[in-house]
């Protein structure tokens, strides 16, 4: 366990979050979010960090993904009912900013074949990149379903201009153990990205979408 957040604290907070969500049943699956508040950090001067870490349990089961594929990848995607678009479909968007923005909004992430990935900025313009959804590379040696699972369970920490971050680390249908594992992994990874590690952390909370925040640190 990470030195600054004890195992007991973590389990207690997770228990509170899960019990809170059981008391008030929602019509949707609540996400559990890790909220981080930083200190001694100047977003203007200090390097803005970003990094990704793969969790054990997928934080968002409803995560939607689209394959921008060559013929083979489109066929593979079709076989497993995954949304996909080929180069012709992308060209039809005609670099129209509104349409590209709509595409970026429609999916949580994209995978693209090697032959397409280099052409995306030229065909679509900067829209996907601006939305923070530039596709991950999909090669032919990779199993499509495994790659999709990997993308679904990977979370990204990205420092913007403000000193607080929030990332989805799970949902309320996960077990205590699964949530604790995901949160523990996320905290350790985040702290490793910070210049002064724990000295940059002001506070850590976890909360479900509609629940009360529980303080970890």
From Swiss-Prot:
SUPFAM superfamilies: Ribosomal protein L1. Coiled coil: none annotated. Pfam families: Ribosomal_L1. InterPro entries: eL8/uL1-like (IPR050257), Ribosomal_uL1 (IPR002143), Ribosomal_uL1-like (IPR023674), Ribosomal_uL1/biogenesis (IPR028364), Ribosomal_uL1_3-a/b-sand (IPR016095), Ribosomal_uL1_CS (IPR023673). The gene is rpl10a. Component of the large ribosomal subunit. The ribosome is a large ribonucleoprotein complex responsible for the synthesis of proteins in the cell. It is found in: Cytoplasm. Component of the large ribosomal subunit. This is Large ribosomal subunit protein uL1. PANTHER family: RIBOSOMAL PROTEIN L7AE FAMILY MEMBER (PTHR23105). Its main location: cytoplasm. GO terms for cellular component: cytosolic large ribosomal subunit. GO terms for biological process: translation. It comes from Xenopus laevis (African clawed frog). One of its GO terms (molecular function) is RNA binding. Belongs to the universal ribosomal protein uL1 family. Keywords: Cytoplasm, Ribonucleoprotein, Ribosomal protein.
């Amino acid at each position: 366990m990470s030195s600054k957040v004890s195992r007991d604290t973590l389990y207690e907070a997770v228990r509170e979050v899960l019990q809170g969500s059981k008391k008030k049943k929602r019509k949707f699956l609540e996400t559990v979010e890790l909220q981080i508040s930083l200190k001694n950090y100047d977003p203007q001067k200090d390097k803005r960090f970003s990094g990704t870490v793969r969790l054990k349990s997928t934080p968002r089961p409803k995560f939607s993904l689209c394959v921008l594929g060559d013929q083979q990848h489109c066929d593979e995607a079709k076989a497993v009912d995954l949304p996909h678009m080929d180069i012709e479909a992308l060209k039809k968007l005609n670099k129209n900013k509104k349409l590209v923005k709509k595409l970026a909004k429609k999916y949580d992430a994209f995978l693209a074949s090697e032959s397409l990935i280099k052409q995306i900025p030229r065909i679509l313009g900067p829209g996907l990149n601006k939305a923070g959804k530039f596709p991950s590379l999909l090669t032919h040696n990779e199993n499509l379903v495994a790659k999709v699972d990997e993308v679904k369970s990977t979370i990204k920490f990205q420092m913007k201009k403000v000193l607080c971050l929030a990332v989805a680390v799970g949902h309320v249908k996960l077990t205590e153990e699964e949530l604790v594992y995901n949160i523990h992994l996320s905290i350790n990874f985040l702290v490793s990205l910070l210049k002064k590690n724990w000295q940059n952390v002001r506070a850590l909370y976890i909360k479900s979408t509609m629940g009360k925040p529980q303080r970890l640190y």
